[in-house]
Amino acid sequence: MTTFSPREIVSELDRHIIGQHDAKRAVAIALRNRWRRQQLDESLRDEVMPKNILMIGPTGVGKTEISRRLAKLAGAPFIKVEATKFTEVGYVGRDVEQIIRDLVEIGIGLVREKKRAEVQAKAHQSAEERVLDALVGSTASPGTRESFRKKLRDGELDDKEIDIEVADSGSGMPGFEIPGMPGANIGVLNLSEMFGKAMGGRTKKVRTTVSKSYTDLVRDESDKLLDNEMIQREAVKSVENDGIVFLDEIDKIAARDGGMGAGVSREGVQRDLLPLVEGTTVSTKYGPVKTDHVLFIASGAFHVAKPSDLLPELQGRLPIRVELKPLTKEDFRRILTETEASLIRQYKALMATEELDLDFTDDAIDALADVAVHLNSSVENIGARRLQTVMERVLDEISFNAPDRGGSAVKIDQEYVKKHVGDLAADTDLSRYIL
């Protein structure tokens, strides 16, 4: 897991998300606390519970983006789920325990990648032997093998086609749940896996070039060197101690005032979430997984519902509240220019593929920010996503005609922006439908 300090985590998030300092700080502290807990001695470590976070803020201000960037930073099993996808236990749909099962799968993937990297050198050696077998046959004399090995290492044989045998990972047949046994997902795939192991594993013949064959062969050879049971044990431990679950759209499962019935995918889901957030044991096909130390970060826009509409017990289990602020004109300007993969940089790169050079002046960027702020205040506040609508509208004509204008340069200034979106932005009725 990551050993970044809170300041480093915040500065990493700053590269992609403008503003929202409070939310970044809360997330950075929570992530650092995971590392701090690991440094404690055994007796105290069990007592330190994660402080779950609730992020509240209008749509399009960076809640989901913070979670996406955090996933890359965490270096720990991390899963982002929408609360709206789940239904109460007993109804058709996914129950919330599936979150932990998916998290374990992610944990296994992480541990396997780490272990593969450790045996990379040995696996590469074995892969080279298999490529030589395919090139000269296993009965060739040592002298022939060595001369081909030299050519292989010099890259002279990279484009030569060879037939190799690689493990067949199955046809991806869907599994099915056994009623009354959640988590015991038995499928055709599992049965074929069982038979495959009994018969020494299934393989398939693939025709490929020497250079491309290495990826499959190295993976194949590394998997032979790995101990699957140890990987599963380590992954379950990693999920129990370092797992992070990001619950998006939590406000959509809050009960509205005056609504009739509990709502299959509303209050019922909240009730099912309670034990998960508090700490329970979930049965997975890799064994039981305790959720006592899994960190939950929930977020929601809370346009219609309020945080107080959530079940009181669930509110109590999300002790850290962070409010994200609506975006100002200056924020929009910075989003367009300062983020690492800003929209302007993206459009410039896209047009450069047609040999068209886009140049945005400072007043054009101001005008774009102005239009976005105006539309957000007069129509509906959708945050930074409004910029995409405005940019698409401004660059619509250029994008369409780009292939015919290759080799030229286009300057986009304030006049150009006003010409393309000014009239729409001014007419509120029109912009309700178009922007």
UniProtKB/Swiss-Prot annotation:
Alphabetical list of InterPro entries matching this protein: AAA+_ATPase, ATP-dep_Clp_protease_ClpX, ATPase_AAA_core, Clp_ATPase_C, HslU, P-loop_NTPase
Main location: cytoplasm
Keyword ATP-binding among UniProt keywords: yes
Similarity-based family: Belongs to the ClpX chaperone family. HslU subfamily.
Assembly: A double ring-shaped homohexamer of HslV is capped on each side by a ring-shaped HslU homohexamer. The assembly of the HslU/HslV complex is dependent on binding of ATP.
General function of this protein: ATPase subunit of a proteasome-like degradation complex; this subunit has chaperone activity. The binding of ATP and its subsequent hydrolysis by HslU are essential for unfolding of protein substrates subsequently hydrolyzed by HslV. HslU recognizes the N-terminal part of its protein substrates and unfolds these before they are guided to HslV for hydrolysis.
Protein name (record): ATP-dependent protease ATPase subunit HslU
